Amino acid sequence: MPGRKFADGEVVRGRWPGSSLYYEVEILSHDSTSQLYTVKYKDGTELELKESDIKPLKSFKQRKSGSTSSSPSRRRSSRSRSRSRSRSPGRAPKGSRRSVSASYQADAKEKEMRREILQVKLTPLVLKPFANSVSVYNGEPEHMEKSATPPKNKQERVILSTEDSYIATQYSLRPRREEVKPKHRVRGTNLVTRGPVPLGTFQVTTPQRRDLEFGGVPGALLIMLGLPACVFLLLLQCAQKDPGLLQFPPPLPALRELWEARVCGVYLLWFFLQALFSLLPVGKVVEGTPLVDGRRLKYRLNGLYAFILTSAAVGTAVFWDIELYYLYTHFLQFALAAIVFSVVLSVYLYARSLKVPRDELSPASSGNAVYDFFIGRELNPRIGAFDLKFFCELRPGLIGWVVINLVMLLAEMKVQERSAPSLAMTLVNSFQLLYVVDALWFEEALLTTMDIIHDGFGFMLAFGDLVWVPFTYSLQAFYLVNHPQDLSWPLTSVIIALKLCGYVIFRCANSQKNAFRKNPTDPKLAHLKTIPTSTWKSLLVSGWWGFVRHPNYLGDLIMALAWSLPCGFNHILPYFYVIYFTALLIHREARDEHQCRRKYGLAWEKYCQRVPYRIFPYIY
């Protein structure tokens, strides 16, 4: 591996990305892996530069002292002065005159260079001053906001999605003579398109994160070991007659009882059947958010079609008396098969990520093998047109959740010898079915979430999508099989009203966000106010997003409480989902907060002042 050329603390000249201008910088550090230098400009800007973009100071001094050439106009011979003429005795010698002229021209050139430097306006991650710059989003600014600079293109005024954490460092440049031209990579595929790059901006590849989340490497190890144990603990506890906290769960069955080839075969059949459904040429094709290099990946949205085909297949199985009760009696075995499959998939994902270019890695990756195996190294792993992460996010786990709930409903009727499912089981199935259908109907919204645009695809998402979602989110239905609950109609009415309230908040907030992102000039949204940012995006500060910073999280939690209440109040186990989901969303909100503060700077501070509550009004 080549050694470094410049030492830490050395003062050199660094080329500003996208231009031919060099500025005085200080070497802060050197990454031996990426061969990039972290440098600091005089205005405090820190960037990572290649060694070829850094020059020692002496090279510039030599050029300055040795530059004695005249301007192009003076280098040309004038026809009127082509013949030699006599020199007056009072004139200085020719060589002295030439040196004075060269010195004068060098000084003039240096002044011109200084003027050129002064005309470059650096605004890295720092907002242009928006004095009270809260404006009506497609109307005239208020009287105190006249100084705010509006975006050049109205279509760029899209809503901030706090899940949308695509990190692009943008600088606003005004060179006099040089136009910054974005560079595009050439790819021979029709699955990728490039979005237009606004004039006056360019993107700098975001370096890999050094501040590790989830407790770093120790936290990642603890989570990877603890999650499978937690799944088995919950399922064993829920199957007991008394699932109280003071009751220890029965011991885990022997491995030879847990591992069944037939169960593994059924699970693999399920996974590949969903993969086949996702490859069907039905549903519209949309583009994702821009990647670091400007590309946009294409996604086929046919999740709802896959759900309909799955429902038809399950209905056919019920019609032909195929024993779905087998899933209930082998629930632990199916959980183990899913765990093993998620681990194998994670190993494959990590192995393939070692061969991909650096610009295809996740911004969350760190360079540590353990942490990257957990968080995921590759951002968008694909096999041809098949996007592994996008597929696993909704299809096998989310649709599998509905199938498991249906099996638990049939199991309740068989175990409790009912002719019809209980009211509590019906509410749980109906509420969660609505939640899944909503996610599949608005599948396009997934493309702007943190999971898709920021986190890589590793153990965290693979285990969460394939194991955690179907086997722990169905805990309420699993609980009701052996712990029946009788609900009164007044209580049922309250639960239904709570569910509808949560769903209205959840859906209206997400719909408002998506509508603003797609068409900021929609007259239906003319009443909304925004805070402009230096990235040409705007932060909604009214409507649902002026109520709390994450109204969709609030609605999500209300719905989670609503589908846990039918399980009664005898045990806390059915409320595990509410407790876990509250902790998850608070943690995710903190991640959103950190990234939005880095991306939007002072505009985010202003937004937080206008909307002080994060999720729960007047509480948090």
Curated annotation (Swiss-Prot):
Gene Ontology biological-process annotations: cholesterol biosynthetic process; neutrophil differentiation; random inactivation of X chromosome
A GO MF label: DNA binding
One Pfam family it belongs to: ERG4_ERG24
PTM note: Phosphorylated by CDK1 in mitosis when the inner nuclear membrane breaks down into vesicles that dissociate from the lamina and the chromatin. It is phosphorylated by different protein kinases in interphase when the membrane is associated with these structures. Phosphorylation of LBR and HP1 proteins may be responsible for some of the alterations in chromatin organization and nuclear structure which occur at various times during the cell cycle. Phosphorylated by SRPK1. In late anaphase LBR is dephosphorylated, probably by PP1 and/or PP2A, allowing reassociation with chromatin.
SMART domains in the cross-refs: TUDOR (SM00333)
Key words of the record: Acetylation, Cholesterol biosynthesis, Cholesterol metabolism, Cytoplasm, DNA-binding, Endoplasmic reticulum, Glycoprotein, Lipid biosynthesis, Lipid metabolism, Membrane, Nucleus, Oxidoreductase, Phosphoprotein, Receptor, Steroid biosynthesis, Steroid metabolism, Sterol biosynthesis, Sterol metabolism, Transmembrane, Transmembrane helix
Chain ranges of the Tudor domain: 1-62
GO cellular component: cytoplasm; endoplasmic reticulum membrane; membrane; nuclear envelope; nuclear inner membrane; nuclear lamina; nuclear membrane; nuclear pore
Phosphothreonine: residues bearing it: 123, 205
Top-rank EC class of the record's enzyme: oxidoreductase
Enzyme nomenclature, EC number: 1.3.1.70
TM region(s), chain numbering: 216-236, 263-283, 304-324, 331-351, 452-472, 486-506, 525-547, 566-586
Functional note: Catalyzes the reduction of the C14-unsaturated bond of lanosterol, as part of the metabolic pathway leading to cholesterol biosynthesis. Plays a critical role in myeloid cell cholesterol biosynthesis which is essential to both myeloid cell growth and functional maturation. Mediates the activation of NADPH oxidases, perhaps by maintaining critical levels of cholesterol required for membrane lipid raft formation during neutrophil differentiation. Anchors the lamina and the heterochromatin to the inner nuclear membrane.
Protein family according to the UniProt entry: Belongs to the ERG4/ERG24 family.
Subunit (UniProt): Interacts with CBX5. Interacts with DNA. Interaction with DNA is sequence independent with higher affinity for supercoiled and relaxed circular DNA than linear DNA. Interacts with lamin B. Interacts with CLNK. Interacts with TMEM147; promoting LBR localization to the nucleus inner membrane.
Designated name of the protein: Delta(14)-sterol reductase LBR
Organism of this sequence: Rattus norvegicus
